[in-house]
Curated annotation (Swiss-Prot):
InterPro entries: Homing_endonucl, Sporu_reg_WhiA_N_dom, Sporulation_regulator_WhiA, Sporulation_regulator_WhiA_C, WhiA_LAGLIDADG_dom. It comes from Bacillus cereus (strain G9842). This is Probable cell division protein WhiA. GO terms for biological process: cell division; regulation of sporulation. Gene3D superfamilies: Homing endonucleases (3.10.28.10). The gene is whiA. Keywords: Cell cycle, Cell division, DNA-binding. Residues 275-309 bind DNA.
């Protein structure tokens, strides 16, 4: 089971107050429901591939409105061939849609979220929970990028979801997709805050555990890469210095170098594996800093380059 499916399964087991049940059910019906007329009767089909969500909708309708609800199961014939669960409501369809603030009295569709549904903070959380159950997804935190989104067919409703989320300081953003719109989060901290808001506490803890391990692993990898790069740079510099010293020795001899440079050249040639700090401790006449050793080695590099260019280097 995917991380998103586990999160939704957890959410379907939450208990709520009556006002919150109404807010969650409104989001579920608005986003997953479709209307049809048969034998002069209006019916509502709420379709999902998640059995736990279908049971949740069925229970909320029975509990909230005491109506007869049908639960149908069909097999998809394409792609994964998953089961499709259809919760069908025939009784009081118009009244329930109006009570959930999905349609007006004249049966015109309400595209945004009614403020009457979300007056209380707990109801705001519940509406977001219903929206996530109906059209939400969240990446497994072990994957390369953090991403949570809620899909909606209508721009007005999508903008309302974004506004509702940002009322909790989530910094969510919207994006148009080919068949609708999404409100999404990309920051790991904001995703965990959203999971907390909708009541997915177990999913939150799992997300955080995985994220901490992943971030620690990334930090270690960055540190190792940095140290490896520095080591490669140091080795490269040492090899260049040794090659230049050998070139000077074979071309004109190290005696052409000033005394201080000649001593460093001989030490670098004879002790190729030691660090600059260790070289500085080996010179005669007292300890020299790393920067001092580096300065002398650069002077040796310059002399080698002049010799390669055919210039004459006089002994100083």
């Amino acid at each position: 089971m995917s991380f998103a499916s586990e999160t939704k399964k957890e959410l379907t087991n939450l208990e709520m107050k009556e006002c919150c049940e109404k807010a969650e059910l409104s989001a579920l019906l608005r986003m997953n429901g479709s209307l049809s007329f048969s034998n002069r009767r209006l019916s509502i089909d709420i379709q999902t591939e998640n059995a736990a969500i279908a049971r949740r909708i069925y229970t909320l309708l029975k509990k909230g409105y005491d109506v007869t609800v049908e639960l149908l199961v069909r097999k998809k014939m394409r792609l994964k061939k998953n089961n499709v669960y259809i919760v069908r409501l025939v009784e009081k369809s118009r009244e329930i849609l109006a009570d959930l603030h999905i349609v007006r009295d004249d049966f015109s569709f309400i595209r945004n979220i009614s403020q009457e549904l979300i007056e209380k903070k707990c109801c705001k959380r519940s509406y977001l929970r219903g929206a996530f159950l109906a059209g939400g997804s969240v990446n497994n935190p072990e994957t390369s990028s953090y991403h949570l989104e809620i899909f909606s067919l209508y721009k007005e409703h999508n903008d309302a979801i974004c506004e509702l989320m940002n009322g909790f300081d989530l910094n969510s953003k919207t994006l148009e997709r080919r068949k609708g719109y999404i409100t999404y989060l990309k920051e790991a901290e904001k995703i965990t805050e959203f999971l907390n808001i909708i009541g997915a506490h177990n999913a939150l803890l799992r997300f955080e555990d995985i994220r901490i391990v992943r971030d620690m692993r990334n930090s270690v990898n960055r540190l190792v890469n940095c140290e490896t790069a520095n080591l490669n740079k140091t080795i490269g510099a040492a090899l260049r210095q040794i090659e230049n010293i050998r070139y000077i020795d074979e071309t004109v001899g190290l005696d052409i170098l000033p005394d201080k440079l000649r001593e460093i050249a001989q030490l670098r040639r004879d002790y190729q594996d030691v660090t600059l700090k260790e070289l500085g401790e080996m010179v005669s006449g007292g300890k020299i800093s790393k920067s001092g050793i580096n300065h002398r080695l650069r002077k040796i590099d310059e002399i080698a380059e002049k010799l390669r260019a055919g210039e004459t280097v006089a002994k100083k």
